[in-house]
A protein has these predicted regions:
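Helix-loop junctions and terminal segments of transmembrane helices
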Residues: 1-12, 17-24
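Interfacial segments at transmembrane-helix termini and the short loops linking adjacent helices
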Residues: 21, 38-69
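Short alpha-helical transmembrane segments in multi-pass integral membrane proteins
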Residues: 23-40, 109, 113-138, 150-154, ...
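Residue-level recognition of transmembrane alpha-helices
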Residues: 27, 59-62, 66, 92-93, ...
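Membrane-embedded alpha-helical segments of multi-pass transporters/permeases
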Residues: 35-40, 48, 61, 100, ...
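Membrane-interface junctions at transmembrane-helix termini in multi-pass inner-membrane proteins
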Residues: 64-94, 109
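Membrane-interface helix-loop junctions in multi-pass transport and translocation proteins
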Residues: 85-86, 93-128, 132, 136, ...
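Membrane-proximal transmembrane or re-entrant/amphipathic helices at the cytosolic face
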Residues: 165-220
């Protein structure tokens, strides 16, 4: 964010656009890595944390909200660094108004789910408006192809994870099934995200072992 603000106020449009795209793509990547876990293992998480499978089902059903929430957080930070505090306040009020309307009008149809629907509307509206404003400020936001590759990887992970989880749950007890499913999902994500050119496993491993070797040399 400090580097983005410096380039913005110096009028370096190309650098600002590149930094913005990199930040948004990184945010989407992190959210995309977490999504299959929550969708596939949401019920297990609910049982583990709250001893309630229904709460876990709600986690799985609302996992997609993680994407607009993440985008809102990073976009708001970047816009504020560009001096757009008034705009981000207006966007926040628009999203909050939509959430309030949902919580007032939807309980009769959705019950307690009205609050979740309101939060989803709030996140989607604020994320969309923030991205539109970022595009206007930076002059570029070319992330369409990246989003398609990320979506394909996430959907494939979920498609593989759901039957794997069902199989493990049928033949294993709760905790072993949960653990095995998580490991299978992690392996599927590494494979599919690499195939979609979303992550570079070799680079990540080199950085990891380089940091470890530096720590060992410092200690010695």
């Amino acid at each position: 964010v400090p580097e983005l603000a410096e380039n913005f106020y110096k009028g370096r449009t190309r650098e600002v656009g590149a930094l913005t795209e990199r930040a948004i793509c990184t945010t989407l990547l992190i959210a995309g890595l977490l999504l299959p876990f929550y969708i596939v293992c949401g019920e297990d998480v609910g049982v583990f944390l709250y001893s309630n499978a229904r709460s876990g089902a709600m986690i799985a059903a609302c996992a997609f909200v993680l994407v607009p929430m993440s985008l809102t957080l990073i976009s708001t930070s970047m816009l504020n660094s560009m001096g757009c505090e008034k705009h981000t306040l207006g966007i926040f009020l628009a999203g909050s108004g939509a959430m309030l309307l949902c919580t007032v009008l939807q309980p009769r149809y959705l019950g307690g789910g009205a609050l979740l629907a309101g939060m989803a509307c709030d996140s989607c509206i604020t994320a969309l408006l923030s991205l539109l404003l970022l595009r206007k400020k930076t002059g570029r936001l070319r992330i369409g192809k990246y989003c398609l590759r990320l979506l394909a990887a996430v959907l494939l992970c979920v498609a593989l994870g759901l039957p794997a989880h069902a199989f493990c749950a049928r033949y294993l007890s709760y905790f072993p099934a949960f653990t095995v499913t998580m490991l299978l999902l992690a392996a599927a994500e590494v494979l599919l995200f690499s195939l979609m050119r979303l992550i570079d496993v070799r680079t990540l491993l080199c950085r990891f072992f380089a940091k470890k070797s530096k720590k060992i040399s410092v200690r010695s």
